[in-house]
Amino acid sequence: MDAALGPPEQMAELEEDLTPMMAQYYELCRQYDDALVLFQVGDFYEAFCAAAKRVARLCEITLTQREDSTGEYPMAGIPIDNAESYVETLLDAGYRVAIADQVEDPDEVSGVVERAVTRIVTPGTLTESELLGGADNNYVAALTAGERYGLALLDISTGDCYATSVGSESAVADELSRFGPAEAIVGPDVDVDRDAVFGPACLVTRYDADAFAQDRAEDRVGQYFGPPERLLAGGAEIRACGGLLAYAEYTRGSSGAVGPDGEPVDPDVDPAGTLDYLNHLTRYDPREYMLLDAVAVESLELFKRRSVRGHENRTLVDTVDETACALGRRKLTDWLRRPLLDADRIEARHGAVAELQRDPATREELSALLAEVYDLERLISRVSRGRANARDLRSLAATLSVVPDIRDHLADADARLLADLHATLDPLAETREEIEAAIRPDPPQQVTEGGVIREGYDEELDRLRSTEQSGKEWIDELEASERERTGIDSLKVGHTSVHGYYIEVTNANLDAVPEDYQRRQTLKNSERYYTPALKEREDEILRAESAADDLEYDLFCAVRDEVADEAERVQALADRLARLDVLVSFAEVAAQYDYCRPTVGSDGIDVTAGRHPVVERTEDAFIPNDTHLGSGPVPASRDGSDDGVTADDIQPFLAVVTGPNMSGKSTYMRQVALICLLAQSGSFVPAKAADLPILDRVFTRVGASDDIAGGRSTFMIEMTELATILDAATENSLVLLDEVGRGTSTADGLAIARAVTEYLHDEVGAYTLFATHHHDLTAVAAALSGATNRHFETSREDGDVRFDHELAPGPAAASYGVEVASMAGVPDSVVERSRDLLADAETADTGVEATRETEVASEPRPGTRADSETDSTATETTGPTENGAASAPAGEATSDDHAQEVFQTNGAAAEDELPESVAQQLASLDVATMTPIEAMNALADLQDRIE
């Protein structure tokens, strides 16, 4: 996108010769050089020169030419009445749009009409309902840097404002992934990877340093929200909020605002309205909520589908959304993106949901009443900015009228949250009564053309209307009286906006025209006249109409201002109605889809018959599965103490999950995460029973693709995500790993997978689900005291593989990769050749991985591994054991040489075969202090030396 969108260079050269109107346009383009200026000329918004070419191309409208004393130049115009759709197109193309309106009445100005930029439309500062396109929040973010990053977010359309500070670039990305801002401004001190932090869809602008200056930021925060030192924690947050407010003022055209380049912007008028409704700032600490980083938000498909195929494009928020109003939809999204860590708050939500679930009649009545609630947050935003029309006020009054009924349905509530809502729902009776007394029930869209104020509200307005009406009645009677007086039966009395009232006589009757008729207009077949009496009545009507319209508009504005004074109360009411709507929605989902009330605060994840909330809606027969992780004592290494816990006492907290593709591994792992997330958001969960811990974070390493633009391969992306998990996961985290180690050699992949498994088990102790096709890894799980093997069962019918989607103990006996290839439509010749190669691999060491793998013993480390039951001399078996690896008959090779070396760790036999230097290096490694990456590098070095 060009840095400036103003007129081309020739206009600068001809600046002194420009017409007054084009000089005005050029000056606005220069002042708002970061935006595309749409310049009102009558009923159109025009763009000229280079900007006209862009507008015509993007909006698919005709490019014309304008000619004046300076020559010809391109021009493109869009009708004001349909401007929103064209503005949306320009926004989608990545442009900001500066709206320059006529701020004078052309009929009252002899020279050029004055114009001013009344608002700047950007992706993150939309307030127009037509452009917002839905109930979801539309945030603009501001970021500053220092010892910590300061982050502020604002939805101008609703007034929602948040602020926080974090310590790293990745933490900034995590917080932004929660809110998904459409636009961001950054201070001059911010140096981050834009795509990685903000994402490619976010419009990012480097804003002027003065806007982020500490003193100015403190003044702005204080002006809107109160003393910043009481609201925010540190200068970074204050600077971020100050810069964000400065940008909001700039886009609203506020007097004294500062543009991106630091230059003051001081238009003559402020039609976009004030930001006085911004009166509540929420400062939050990310550590108070379950942390969902950008990877988890994407892979769990909380708010956006990764693929447009399947599942009816449903996300989690779509699936559990039974909210009745826009307020509830936004609040639901907020609760899901910030699951709670406080058990009392979680239980309070569950208690309210339980009471509503038990009472379907109340739930249905509340839902019906909430469906009558308009979007109060956006309504009061428009009211406060002076952009609301009479219909907006009636919508607000209609919402207030249902609040008493909502309160009545909560009068007998026992649940704490419901009782609190009953006590605090404010019906704003005086505000509703004032609106209903002043505004007609079905007012026109425009507030300047009359018909807005009720009769009886204002005596002077009633008098003017009476004068206007009596004058029109006199005119209505004039036609009959003049026909009688003149004897002209075809005589008509009419009105045009240009010539006013007239008496029309056809040419055939001109001889009968009285002397007091004065000619007003000549037509082809008739003449139009007026009389002194008609002119007098017309002037009287026009004076009354004009005075009534002016008075009516003044009265409307006064009512609107009174409502704006109650903005804080309206916003508080909106928040409470939104919370109630979400609780009712949770209860409705629980009742319709058989969700259970979870118990939170347990020592482990214990789910009976759990289901994936999204997938179960799209499949006729979803197979539920149990999950049991870490509900017993933990290994000594998890809490740093040695309390005498033995391997026999440990309930596994790490599960290695095997099974063919399409068997359900990924769905199952995501299902566990979504159940935990829903529970901590306050919802019931899709299961028969659920005892859950309070998770501090959910990590996902599920699927990846190349980042070609960033120069990162799939494997590099996977390792980067893995490093984040190993560095940040705690014993209270849930880790989902799917196929770690792809994109490199089998030996490297197995080595990494094993090292990661051991580190998560020995050092982190996080609740972990590790899906893999590396069946050698099942031997590692069998040897770890806090780990277990689980697999998805398959069966055969008439030689075909059937996926049962049932989770069972032990590892899978085979991968069924060839069968899956056949089901996918791979040519028969390739499938048959694959079967031949696989058969060879099962009978000889050909370097092709077999489908059944040899159990390899691993000597346990004291206090963390099981021992005797995984001895390498165990009885030969051909099927999976309860927790052991699937084993093949003695002597049957099942994996390539490198993979066997990685997993052959049993005692002196292997060590005797190692070169002495390798053995010495191996003995010198301090495994207890090595990081996972250091361990992987050391292992790779040893492999190179052995080879």
UniProtKB/Swiss-Prot annotation:
Top-level lineage group: Archaea
Region (Disordered): 623-643, 841-916
A single GO molecular function term of this UniProt record: ATP-dependent DNA damage sensor activity
A Pfam family recorded for this sequence: MutS_IV
Keyword annotations of the record: ATP-binding, DNA damage, DNA repair, DNA-binding, Nucleotide-binding
A GO biological process held by the record: mismatch repair
Residues the entry annotates as binding ATP: G659, P660, N661, M662, S663, G664, K665, S666
Alphabetical list of HAMAP family matching this protein: MutS
PANTHER family recorded: DNA MISMATCH REPAIR PROTEIN MSH1, MITOCHONDRIAL (PTHR11361:SF34), DNA MISMATCH REPAIR PROTEIN MUTS FAMILY MEMBER (PTHR11361)
Annotated function: This protein is involved in the repair of mismatches in DNA. It is possible that it carries out the mismatch recognition step. This protein has a weak ATPase activity.
Family classification: Belongs to the DNA mismatch repair MutS family.
UniProt protein name: DNA mismatch repair protein MutS 2
Source organism of the structure: Haloarcula marismortui (strain ATCC 43049 / DSM 3752 / JCM 8966 / VKM B-1809) (Halobacterium marismortui)
Name of the gene encoding the protein in the UniProt record: mutS2
